[in-house]
């Protein structure tokens, strides 16, 4: 938008520190979907597609609570919203809740996860699209499958598609197939990996961002 007023505007994305966030293959005894952050409004972040897909997977006897968990690291107010929605879809037995953890614990938590959850929603044309938080880029860095529900159909979806890092979903059947695929991979190997395009991924590293800043200053 700013380029309409000044053609010299440059966009440098937020990103991840590759010395802290990098992929590790850690076997786990359970399939774990992890979310870290707040959920203060379903209008901004909505897990409905995830919960509906889990309900279907349960009905089809694909998953059971003993081996399939959704782990939330969030605050009390957010947990209240999540519990209400999970109960409405009949999937509360799959939920685990934790308080926030120190930032130093996050890399290991992400690498022990089977799927990393990014919650968003589609906004109308007059509103903002796609909150691309640091958490999203850190999820990219560990090369675990990212599930974005509901797709913002904008910048988050584009980044996920460009990096081949997961799914920005708009339908329940997409989430169903995505989770079933990675649940079966976890059953076979004990962990999951995402076929990330590392050339595209490197564009979001702090090292690359520093290079972009340096290039801009050289042009001034």
What positions do the PLM features span?
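A short, active-site helix/loop in glycosyltransferases that binds the activated sugar's phosphate group
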Residues: 1-8
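Short hydrophobic beta-strand element within catalytic cores of glycosyltransferases
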Residues: 115-118, 138-150
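A conserved mid-protein helix/loop that constitutes part of the nucleotide-sugar donor-binding site
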Residues: 41-59
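A charged, aromatic-enriched C-terminal amphipathic alpha-helix characteristic of glycosyltransferases
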Residues: 170-174, 187-219
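Carbohydrate-associated surface elements
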Residues: 15, 27
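Acidic donor-binding loop of glycosyltransferase active sites
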Residues: 110-129
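Nucleotide-activated donor-binding/catalytic signature segment of Leloir-type glycosyltransferases, i.e.
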Residues: 67-74, 79-107
């Amino acid at each position: 938008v700013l380029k309409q007023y000044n053609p010299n505007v440059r966009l440098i994305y937020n990103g991840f520190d590759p010395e802290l966030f990098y992929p590790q293959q850690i076997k786990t005894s359970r399939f774990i979907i992890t979310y870290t952050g707040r959920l203060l409004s379903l209008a901004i972040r909505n897990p409905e597609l995830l919960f509906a897909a889990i309900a279907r997977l349960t009905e089809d006897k694909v998953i059971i609570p003993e081996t399939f968990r959704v782990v939330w690291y969030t605050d009390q107010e957010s947990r209240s919203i999540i519990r209400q929605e999970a109960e409405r879809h009949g999937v509360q037995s799959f939920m685990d809740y934790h308080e926030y953890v120190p930032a130093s614990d996050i890399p290991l938590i992400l690498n022990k996860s089977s799927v990393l959850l990014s919650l968003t929603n589609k906004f109308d044309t007059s509103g903002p699209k796609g909150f691309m938080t640091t958490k999203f880029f850190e999820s990219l860095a560990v090369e675990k499958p990212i599930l974005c529900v509901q797709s913002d159909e904008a910048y988050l979806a584009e980044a996920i598609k460009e990096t081949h890092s997961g799914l920005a979903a708009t339908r329940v059947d997409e989430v169903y197939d995505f989770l079933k695929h990675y649940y079966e991979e976890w059953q076979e190997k004990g962990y999951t990996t995402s076929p990330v395009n590392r050339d595209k991924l490197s564009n979001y590293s702090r090292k690359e961002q520093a290079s972009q800043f340096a290039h801009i200053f050289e042009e001034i």
